[in-house]
């Protein structure tokens, strides 16, 4: 390039009006959930939005029956009573669905993120098509006790989660080894079967959402979720948003070689998944077919070696997640962690790393929350133009 030649500036990504509208709605909903009861004046201050925008969103929420106004008692005897806004818990409900190869877990959730009902359906050990699973979920949906919900028509959305790589915007499961699926359009199948709007998320990101809600961690608190069990995966929120990556593959780490160019056994999958641990234990004791068998054998040197290897690689990935994300909390979850929790506490670096709740409960709760947030945003969009 010559001295007189001017380098053209790189293009700047401009956020369109649709993005601004979505961001404003999400901001108002987050403040309502975290700070209620809250006045309109406080909403303007906390969101840094204009009074006009706040009024439009709030009026839409009131018209939809999702929030209500209440008078607060003034701190002093003089002065007008402030009008506060509160979330109406029974204004809307969502259903969460978690699909695994051997069972379906569902829940019903109100607008206060309270699980009011849950159910589990065992499955035969065989391959199920998406249509078959959607039909079974419809049966579970229709069999839920009607008296638990103020009005059955208030169930407005379904969140579906499964293990694997998913593309939420396309409603498609790109690949799920556990379910035996590849390029499956799951959202359309469930919507046609049950007749409600459907949102899709993978299991690790659903668990992250569910765990944060259960622990009262607000959206702006950076958090990472490390799943270890049927697979190995990571999900993280950064500045209030779930990290997804270029092709929605953020956190898919189980097949990444620990040493580049080395054989398959150097991937995290070989050292941290439940199936791999059981396979290694069975090579010493063929009667072992679950993790409990390995735990009962910890008085033997080979079992101690398997556990030591597991802890070494778990510590490695925890440090990697901490170094890359530097989150406020790292939550360990998955099917293996609760079973091995007593034996891994010595490798947890500090109080920021905690043991998660039940993996399936967190996942189905997160799926319901994803659907709840999605449908409320859609309902508001129908009511207003910002």
Where does each model-flagged region fall?
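Short, acidic, Ser/Thr-enriched surface-loop or helix-capping motifs
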Residues: 110, 168, 237
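Short, acidic Gly/Pro/Ser/Thr-rich loop/turn segments
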Residues: 102-104, 165-167, 233
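Glycine/GP-enriched mid-protein hinge/lid loop-to-helix segment characteristic of carbohydrate kinases
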Residues: 118-120, 128-132, 182, 193-302, ...
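Short glycine-aspartate micro-motif
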Residues: 84, 94-98, 155-159, 223-227, ...
């Amino acid at each position: 390039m010559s001295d007189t030649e001017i380098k053209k500036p790189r293009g700047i990504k401009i956020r369109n009006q649709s993005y601004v509208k979505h961001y404003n709605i999400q901001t108002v909903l987050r403040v309502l959930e975290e700070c209620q009861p809250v006045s309109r004046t406080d909403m303007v201050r906390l969101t840094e939005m204009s009074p006009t925008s706040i009024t439009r969103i709030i009026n839409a929420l009131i018209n939809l029956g999702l929030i209500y106004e209440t008078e607060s008692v003034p701190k002093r005897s003089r002065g007008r009573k402030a009008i506060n806004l509160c979330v109406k818990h029974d204004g809307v409900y969502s259903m969460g669905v978690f699909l695994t190869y051997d069972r379906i877990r569902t829940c019903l959730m109100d607008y206060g993120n309270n699980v009011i009902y849950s159910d589990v359906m065992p499955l035969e050990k065989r391959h199920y098509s998406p249509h078959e699973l959607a039909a079974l979920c419809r049966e579970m949906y229709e069999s839920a006790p009607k008296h638990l919900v103020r009005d059955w028509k208030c169930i407005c959305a379904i969140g579906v989660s499964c293990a694997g790589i998913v593309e939420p915007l396309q409603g498609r499961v790109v690949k799920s080894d556990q379910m035996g699926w590849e390029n499956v359009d799951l959202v359309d199948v469930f919507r046609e079967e049950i007749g409600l709007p459907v949102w899709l998320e993978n299991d690790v990101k659903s668990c992250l959402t569910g765990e944060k809600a259960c622990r009262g961690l607000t959206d702006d608190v950076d958090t990472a979720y490390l799943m270890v069990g049927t697979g190995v995966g990571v999900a993280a929120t950064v500045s209030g948003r779930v990290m997804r990556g270029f092709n929605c593959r953020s956190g898919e780490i189980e097949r990444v070689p620990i040493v580049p160019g080395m054989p398959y056994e150097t991937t995290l999958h070989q050292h941290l998944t439940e199936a791999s641990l059981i396979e290694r234990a069975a090579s010493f004791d063929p009667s072992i077919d679950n993790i409990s068998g390995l735990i009962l054998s910890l008085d033997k040197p080979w079992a101690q070696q398997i556990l030591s290897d597991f802890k070494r690689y778990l510590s490695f990935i925890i440090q990697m997640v901490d170094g890359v994300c530097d989150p406020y909390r790292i939550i360990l979850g998955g099917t293996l962690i609760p079973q091995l929790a007593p034996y891994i506490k010595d490798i947890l670096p500090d109080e920021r790393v905690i043991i998660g709740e039940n993996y399936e409960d967190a996942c189905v709760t997160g799926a319901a929350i994803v659907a709840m947030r999605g449908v409320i945003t859609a309902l508001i969009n129908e009511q207003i133009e910002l």
